[in-house]
């Protein structure tokens, strides 16, 4: 599977949470990072977007080189 999501430094949301959920179900999660977020429960301090072309390239390379069964 592949998750297309932001990176949450607290691991309570975003691709880190998606990866934990995938692991709990016995799946391996590829990622495409859309943004990096500085946050904690109830607080978002900063968001930095990833260039859309880089996000698209992450998706493409994952699809080209790995068996992706779900997105």
Regions found by a protein language model. Give the residues of each.
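Conserved N-terminal subdomain of the carbohydrate kinase-like
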Residues: 1-3, 19-70
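Short, glycine-rich nucleotide/cofactor-binding loops
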Residues: 3-12
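Residue-level recognition of alpha-helix initiation/capping sites
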Residues: 12-13, 53
